[in-house]
Amino acid sequence: MVVDDLHRLASSQFKLPVAPILFTALAATIGAFLLSSLRSYILYHRKMSLFPAPNSDSAFRSFFSSKARDKFLSNAQELIRQGFSQNKFAIRLKTDFTDVLLLSPRYLPQLRTEDRLQGGPYTVQELLGYLPGFEPFRFADQMPKFIPDVILTRMNRYLSNVPASITEEVEVNLAENWTDEKDWHSVHLHGTMLGLVGQCSIRTFLGPEMCRKKRWVDLHTEYTVAVVTAVQALRKWPRALVSIVQWFHPKAKAARALLNEARAMIQPMHEQRKRDMAAGKPVPADTLTWFEEVAKGQAYDAAVVQLTMALAGLHSSTDLLCAVMLNLSEHPDVVEALRQELVQVLKREGWKQTTFSQLTLMDSVLKESQRLKPVGRAFFKRVAVDNIKLDHGVEIPKGAFVAVSNHGMWDPHNYTDPDKFDAYRFARMSDNKSSAFSTVSVEHTGFGFGKNSCPGRNYVALQLKIILAHLLLKYEWRLPDNYTPATFNNGFDLIADPFAQVLVRRRLEAPEVSLRQNT
């Protein structure tokens, strides 16, 4: 007993107090973290301050004033011109969501395989993908290879089926929306083309039943419009308040409701498809099957995947189709040349996938329209996950939001008369592989560049050519008198006149060739 008491007494004399030690360690850890964060913050802003900023503003002023943001939204073109006149390598722009380091396209060869620049985090922040109802904008960050793998390893294998299936949807849609009326009548160009592209895409993604299900076709387009307009509305609020405001904002509430409706429609189909595949039953070759094959048991939200696909391609494809049609409405001689090319090639080759790769002039018109008005003034949007050194002394700090300017597509060093629509520009280069519509290059970045260029561009090219073939051989269209279409500028975004009405009528002559696949 005595020995034990002495042992306990001796031990107690040397026992250090636990609470002060933990407090000291915690304080030291927090202090080190804060010092490290402060150091990173200072280094980041020091590096970013080296670049010209044509619409710069202090953090304090930008919180209470929208002046810098408004300059960006209304006149990004002039800001970019001013910036690159001061520094031809890189500039800093205060956009409507953060500061962006905008690089010259000369850096594309260096950036094409750069793994320290990641696209997912940029999209999440720019398009508010962290909010409920906006999940399609964060899907690519959570599962970055999922959709590209499905497109490259599954969907592209079935492109030979596309001409026959899509032509059915084009016929149905145009008969309903453009009608067979042979007198001139007015239609809303963007609205009718959005529905047409959406129906054709759904036919490829989900098959004939869903693409004729009006509520899904409407929801498919309604959600993409609702969520994009919600993003635009919420970005007008201070960033710190967005997570609160979104619960009450009507546009954000509409996006959430539409996503929930999409889940109610897609989830039962997804569950049934999984059961059929597990039982070894025959299943259609569509995205429900392909995503399940690629997922290999990994959980995912099937409705979010479908809407992510829609957001990735629906608006950009529709916008390009509208741009082409507006350009052609001002060049009737090109319309006639396109018709002649179609008749000649279709008579020789028939209505099949390989035929459409031989439409040299149509390729040129699509590529030239995309060059003259891409979907944005910037692309290759990324976040730097580490410090990156580029040529000519340009250093990208860790955490920087980075994009590449598209001004190479309007550079007179790359193109003669770059501001002019030249339908034959790329047709004259047809012996050059880079002249094909779906080919990317440093000079033409309509589909991006490098390993992360659009994986679905071959499908997009085929889909748009099929639609144009129907429009050219079956219809005439023109602009109303005294109407000049205008490109809508909104920050980096460039949108073919979303308000344009066109006058259309069914051609008096029947199509000179069949727009159906020979059986």
From Swiss-Prot:
Cofactor: heme
Residues annotated for heme binding in this entry: 454
CDD domains in the record: CYP503A1-like (cd11041)
Membrane-spanning residues: 16-36
A biological process term (GO) from this entry: secondary metabolic process
Compartments in which it is found: Membrane
Topology term for the membrane: Single-pass membrane protein
Broad class of the protein's primary localization: membrane
UniProt pathway: Mycotoxin biosynthesis
GO cellular component, one term: membrane
Keywords carried by this UniProt record: Glycoprotein, Heme, Iron, Membrane, Metal-binding, Monooxygenase, Oxidoreductase, Transmembrane, Transmembrane helix
InterPro entries on file: Cyt_P450 (IPR001128), Cyt_P450_E_grp-IV (IPR002403), Cyt_P450_sf (IPR036396)
Gene3D superfamilies per UniProt: Cytochrome P450 (1.10.630.10)
Glycosylation sites: 177, 327, 414, 432
The EC number(s) this enzyme carries: 1.-.-.-
Enzyme class: oxidoreductase
Parts forming coiled coils: none
GO molecular function, one term: iron ion binding
Cystine crosslinks: none
Keyword Transmembrane helix (UniProt): yes
Function: Cytochrome P450 monooxygenase; part of the 2 gene clusters that mediate the biosynthesis of fusicoccins, diterpene glucosides that display phytohormone-like activity and function as potent activators of plasma membrane H(+)-ATPases in plants by modifying 14-3-3 proteins and cause the plant disease constriction canker.
Family classification: Belongs to the cytochrome P450 family.
Identification of the protein by name: Dideacetyl fusicoccin A C-19 hydroxylase
Organism the protein comes from: Phomopsis amygdali
